[in-house]
């Protein structure tokens, strides 16, 4: 069972906050809302559809950051990538609800927040 003000889907609880903040602030905010809380993550397109049905805005942070730095990259010759020269600005992911597109953007930008536990 989810607390009041939270919505339930497939054993998880979700809460939509129509307040914009940076990714770091949003993730910290979600951890403070409920034990085990984090920015929303998705395991299926049905989960996305559920969330979109309760949203009142388009763009929101997802719990995924540093997409390029976290990937296990390798060069075309098969050798491991040990040297990286990405831009200094870390990238985080927002979801655009109107068409369920995931977009890479600066983590320092502000977007709405959806928490999940």
UniProtKB/Swiss-Prot annotation:
Expression across tissues: Expressed by the venom gland.
Record keywords: Disulfide bond, Hemostasis impairing toxin, Platelet aggregation inhibiting toxin, Secreted, Toxin
Domain C-type lectin per the UniProt entry, residue ranges: 9-116
Domain of life per record: Eukaryota
SUPFAM superfamilies for this protein: C-type lectin-like (SSF56436)
Leader sequence segment: none
Record-annotated disulphide pairs: 2-13, 30-115, 92-107
GO molecular function annotations of the record: toxin activity
Family designation: Belongs to the snaclec family.
Name assigned to this protein: Snaclec CHH-B subunit beta
UniProt source species: Crotalus horridus (Timber rattlesnake)
